[in-house]
Structure formats: structure tokens, C-alpha cells
A protein has these predicted regions:
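Structural signature of PLP-dependent enzymes
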Residues: 504-528
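Conserved PLP-binding catalytic core of the aspartate aminotransferase-like
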Residues: 139, 520-525, 531-564, 614-629
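Active-site PLP attachment segment
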Residues: 53, 90, 449-481, 492-499
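Active-site core of PLP-dependent enzymes with the aminotransferase class I/II
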Residues: 384-390, 402-428
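PLP-dependent aspartate aminotransferase-fold enzymes
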Residues: 292-399
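PLP-dependent enzyme catalytic core of the Aspartate aminotransferase-like
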Residues: 508-510, 518, 569-629
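N-terminal glycine-rich, Lys/His-bearing helix-loop that initiates the first secondary-structure elements
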Residues: 196-303, 420, 576, 587, ...
Length: 629
């Protein structure tokens, strides 16, 4: 009997098995225990022999031996995996129907329901027995969970073809004379699927079909907690995220990478979007909301007169660069900050792969970026006006693009000095506010410093989770967009600007920037407080609403990993940065710090000599962006 799920992905498998003349029973994807109960009941089974689909080589002779032993021993449950001595992939479980039914009544946790037999194996109500191999060969991996496993199994099967009745002893003989056959899947942990969360399982699948595994470097699990990060979400509301195993996790981390300053699923924003979905998101005609949004943003920034929209921050910055170059007729650009992934930006690394080390990540290779862009993008460090002056004195610059504030704010009137230089030399000054916008002011952070750019780019928080970015600028610059080609179909969809208009309404009504700035300052103070009480040296940085800390230690990354690991066990998504949302109430934050304090005590123990790596359940997280806000 094949007991598989009702998921349509198994339709083809079910059809093949039925055509071969075998019975197929289908049931729940996640409640596999109930699926087994249904399959056993449908066939009037007294005894169930469980062979999972990842064990293609399982030996019929071994099954017969174990079944005879099971019947003569009159026990409830028998396996050959507790402890394992046979190769991974030769797993056999045998149990009474009565025991299966009883375990189905007892087992309540999602883990027990998914993995069928944990209750049978661990509950004292059931009698057990284990079948041991004459020689322990449990180090061999002959199961099929990953592509590497399939390659190994195929290599062995091909040696026996066309036979399909080869035994375990024959396989061991082939491996002895051809040890290279089993090198392809070395290093994969036995039964890792039994302890791996659903997110990690999907992440392993993702890496087979998506280069890098996902679309955003900042969301890769190795940036947080390698091998254990939940990786994917099923739903999100407020500051709670549910993973694929339906665990509710409080997000005290980066809130969608800064996209949701009003919290996930804000009712007013979502209601506006839902109406747009009902009324229609696209048509041959333009959506009026793009006009309303342009007028709204221009009114908020009196120096600006025109706007263009896109759907990602990288696009917005690329649009701005194109317009600035068209307006000035000059191709060279000076940058200070992180401005996306496009060719124009990564061209900075054509001279050396470390040019962007202090702006984004060290070691970025500009593969695929045309060599003829070399020298078109020049960098200067934040708060180093002398470096910008040197660039201007030796290059014909068309534009300066920079973040208004980085991990630390401007010193010695930096922004005004940059403005003065740009004006003096006829250079277009652009402020990248994709991350900093709407965090500390209603609009661009530059408003707080009283310095007006020629162009500014906004994103992330503008749509509270919906894709919308904006390029604002003076008419004298923006009209150059008509002298080049900047156009894209999905920049005309309606959901983005609708969400932005609703988001701006809520922000203005609640003064959201004041709320998140105040709470961000409080979070920073709490980090400093528990660090001081535990005798730990930390450094804090970033805008209050984009606050972060790092332990001043050579083990800073290990400590970041430890924080994430221990707080995940307490149902928090956490690390060393918090992108604050209005839904982060004092009650939520105080509860978080009450749980975090013991982790800081652990860090102190490690600073005093305890091995931090001995506390980690997996590898250390990767280093992330140099720029956090």
C-alpha cells in the first residue's frame, strides 16, 4: 500500500503505483500519523510494516527476518534504527495496529503527527525491540533525500542493472570494491529531516532551483542562524510571524528588511489594497493613484517638483543615475553608501573588488559588469569631505549619490558642505533615502538637517510591505528623463501607489516616525543597560528606528549567532539589529529584554573564558552588510 498525501505533486506517483496494481491511500500532508491510521484501517491490517519512500534499497530478506522476530517476541514496536547499525536507507519499522491506534490518540505535537512513530518509540506504554546488524555500517548513506543521494543510489543501481532484487550484502560487497561510489553524499547528517524545521527543508530545495536560494542576500538563513533559521513564513500580523511549522514568532529583528514600519498587515493599508484588487490592478489606462502620490510627495518636500515611480530601491537609484547623467551630460558619479545591485553601482569594483567594502560588503566581484564602465563610479567615505573634494578636483562628476546618515550621523556640517560643493561645480546631488525615509521625519531624513538635494529616492517603508519606490527631483533635473528611455510595464500597476497613499495617511495621523524613534532609543538604552549589568562592552549604531549593536569582541559574530539561536528557542526572531515598527509596544519590548538578559549573561561567561562555539548548535552566521541603516 502506498500511503501518500493529497498534495497534487503526488498525483503522478499515485497514478504510476495504481497502474502497477497496488493500492494507494491518500491523506494529510502534515498529519502523516493519521494518514497511516487511515491506510491501515482501509486494508484491515493487524500489523504495519513501515518503509519510507527515501529507502529504495530496503532488503526484503531483512524485512522477513524482522517480521518473524516481531511476531515471536509479541511486542508493540520494532525497528532497526534505535540505535542505527544498518546503512541509512535500510530503515524498517514494524508495529501492531492496536499500538498505532493508541499512539494516534496520545500523540498531539506537530512533530509526532508528522513523523508517525515518535510516540511508539518513546512512550513507556509500548514494548520495543531493535534489530542490530552483525557489523555496524550505519555510517553508509544509501537513502534519497537530496540530489547527491540520488546520484549515489543511481551509481550503485546501475552496477546491478537490469537486476532489481540485489540484497544488502551484495551492495556492501560492491561498495567494498568500489568505495568511490559513496563519496558523493558524505557529510549529510543521518535523519536530518526528522529534526530539521520545515523552513530549512524548503531552503535546501530552494538552493537546487534558485541561484543563491532566494532573491535577497539579507534574507538568506546563513545571515541569521545557519541550519536552524525558519527561513520562510506562512503569515504575518503586527510584529508576529508564523513559520511553516505554525510557530508564532515575535519579530524583534529587521521587520521585512525595514519595509513595515507600521507593522505587518496594517488594517487600513491592507483594506485600501484589497479594494484595489477588487476594482482591478492593471488596465490599458493609467492608474490615477500615481498622480495623487506624486503630488503628495512633492508637497511634503517643497524643493522637489516632479516624481517617477518604480517598485524596488535598486531600480529607483538606477533611474536617478540615468536622469542625472542625462541632465548633466557627464557619466562619472561619486557615491557614499549602499545603492543597489545594478551595473552602474557595482562598476565601482572594476578597479578593485574592495572598493565597496565599506559601503556594502567586502569581496564583491563585479562579474558580468561591462569593463568599459571602469572608472565611472568613484567612492568616498562618510564624514570625509576631503575625499569628495579630491574626487571633484580630479574628475568631471555629473552626480553625487549618498545616504544622508549611515551607521553614524553627519559631522562638522557634512551635508551642507556636500551641498555647497555640488552647487559650486554644477553636480546633481542625490540623497538615497530608500531606507532612512520616514524613520525620523515625515519624509526624507534630510529635512531634519535642513539640506535640500536635487533628487531623492524613497522606498522600503513607503508602502508598508507593498512594492513602491519613488524618485523625487527638481524640474530642471527630472525633465531630462524625457531625453532618455526609462519605462517599465509593472511600474504602472496600482497596488503600490495605493498602498503608499494609505501608508502616508496612517503615518501622518499617528506621527509614526516619532513613535518608532522613541521606541528605538528605548531599545538602544536597554541593550546598553543589560550589557553594563553583565559587564559586556558593546557598540550601538544607526538611526534610533534602525538601531543595532555589536559586542566589542573578536567573537562578535559568534555572539550574534548565539543571540539569534537562544532567542529563537524563546519564540523570537532576533539578532543584533531591530527595525522598529509602531506595533513594538513597551510591553512587547520589555518582555523581549527579560528573555534576552540571560543570553547576555551567557555572553559574559564566554568573554570570561567559556567556549562560545560549544554553545552553538550549528555554524556561525555570515557577516552581513557593512551598512545597516
Amino acid at each position: 500500500v502506498l500511503a501518500t498525501s493529497t498534495n497534487e505533486i503526488n498525483d503522478q506517483l499515485s497514478a504510476v503505483v495504481e497502474n502497477l496494481g497496488f493500492q494507494v491511500i491518500r491523506g494529510s500532508e502534515n498529519d502523516v500519523l493519521q494518514r497511516y491510521v487511515d491506510a491501515a484501517a482501509a486494508t484491515n491490517a493487524d500489523v504495519v510494516i513501515r518503509i519510507t519512500g527515501d529507502c529504495p534499497f530496503v532488503d526484503p530478506q531483512l524485512i522477513d527476518e524482522m517480521l518473524g522476530d516481531f511476531i515471536s517476541s509479541n511486542i508493540d514496536y520494532m525497528s532497526n534504527t534505535d540505535p542505527p547499525t544498518f546503512p541509512d536507507g535500510f530503515d524498517i519499522e514494524i508495529f501492531k495496529m492496536s499500538a498505532l491506534l493508541q499512539s494516534a490518540e496520545i500523540a498531539t505535537s506537530p512533530f509526532e503527527r508528522e513523523h508517525v512513530t515518535p510516540c511508539l518509540r518513546t512512550n513507556s506504554l509500548f514494548s520495543h525491540k531493535n534489530k542490530a546488524a552483525v557489523v555496524d555500517v550505519s555510517h553508509l548513506r544509501l537513502t534519497v533525500d537530496e540530489q547527491r543521494d540520488l546520484d549515489v543510489v543511481r551509481g550503485i543501481a546501475n552496477l546491478f542493472a537490469p537486476r532489481t532484487d540485489f540484497s544488502l550484502s551484495e551492495i556492501l560487497g560492491v561498495i567494498t570494491t568500489n568505495p568511490h561510489l559513496i563519496t558523493g553524499n558524505l557529510g549529510i547528517e543521518r535523519n536530518e529531516g526528522a529534526t530539521m524545521n520545515s523552513g530549512q527543508k524548503l531552503w535546501k530545495r530552494a538552493q537546487q532551483v534558485i541561484p543563491g536560494g532566494n532573491m535577497l542576500l539579507s534574507k538568506r538563513p546563513d545571515q541569521f542562524l545557519p541550519e536552524h533559521w525558519p527561513a520562510y513564513f506562512s503569515k504575518a500580523l503586527g510584529c508576529t510571524v508564523w513559520d511553516l511549522d505554525d510557530n508564532a514568532l515575535t519579530d524583534m529583528s529587521i521587520m521585512g528588511i525595514g519595509t513595515n514600519s507600521l507593522g505587518y498587515g496594517h488594517p487600513e493599508v491592507d483594506a485600501a489594497v484589497a479594494k484595489t484588487v477588487r476594482d482591478g490592478n492593471m488596465s490599458t489606462l493609467n492608474c490615477p493613484e500615481e498622480v495623487y502620490l506624486a503630488e503628495r510627495l512633492v508637497a511634503m518636500h517643497p524643493w522637489a517638483e516632479m516624481a517617477r515611480f518604480a517598485r524596488t530601491g535598486g531600480e529607483a537609484n538606477a533611474i536617478a543615475i540615468r536622469i542625472a547623467r542625462a541632465a548633466t551630460g557627464k557619466s562619472k558619479v561619486a557615491i557614499c553608501g549602499y545603492h543597489g545591485w545594478h551595473d552602474w553601482y557595482l562598476a565601482a569594483n572594476l578597479g578593485t573588488e574592495n572598493t565597496l567594502a565599506g559601503h556594502l560588503l567586502p569581496g564583491l566581484e563585479p562579474n558580468g559588469v561591462p569593463e568599459n564602465l571602469r572608472g565611472s563610479v568613484l567612492t568616498f567615505n562618510y564624514n570625509r569631505i576631503d575625499e569628495l573634494e579630491a574626487l571633484i578636483s580630479t574628475h568631471e562628476l555629473g552626480a553625487i549619490m549618498m545616504e544622508v546618515s549611515r551607521n553614524f550621523g553627519p559631522e562638522d556640517d557634512l551635508l551642507q558642505k556636500v551641498r555647497n560643493l555640488a552647487t559650486k561645480h554644477g553636480i546633481v546631488l542625490m540623497f538615497d533615502e530608500c531606507t532612512s525615509g520616514f524613520r525620523q521625519t515625515f519624509g526624507g531624513l534630510h529635512k531634519m538637517f535642513g539640506v535640500e538635494p536635487d533628487m531623492a529616492m524613497f522606498g522600503k517603508a513607503l508602502g508598508n510591505g507593498y512594492a513602491i519606490t519613488a524618485v523625487l527631483g527638481k524640474r530642471s533635473v527630472m525633465e531630462a528623463a524625457q531625453n532618455t528611455f526609462i519605462s517599465s510595464t509593472f511600474w504602472t500597476e496600482r497596488i503600490g501607489p495605493t498602498a503608499a497613499l494609505a501608508t502616508l495617511d496612517v503615518m501622518e495621523q499617528t506621527k509614526s516616525w516619532e513613535i518608532i524613534t522613541k521606541m528605538g532609543s528605548y531599545i538602544t538604552e536597554q541593550w546598553q543597560s543589560i550589557a553594563k549589568s553583565n559587564g559586556i562592552a558593546i557598540k550601538t549604531s544607526g538611526l534610533p528606528a534602525l538601531t543595532s549593536f555589536s559586542v566589542d569582541s573578536k567573537f562578535a559574530l559568534e555572539y550574534k549567532t548565539l543571540v539569534t539561536q537562544e532567542m529563537l528557542k524563546k519564540s523570537y526572531l532576533a539578532g543584533t539589529s531591530v527595525y522598529v515598527a509602531t506595533v513594538h509596544t513597551k510591553e512587547i519590548v520589555d518582555r523581549f529584554f527579560a528573555e534576552l538578559e540571560p543570553v547576555f549573561a551567557l555572553i559574559k561567561e564566554c568573554e570570561d573564558g567559556r567556549d562560545v562555539k560549544s554553545l552553538l548548535d550549528g555554524p556561525t552566521c555570515s557577516s552581513s552588510f557593512k551598512r545597516l541603516n
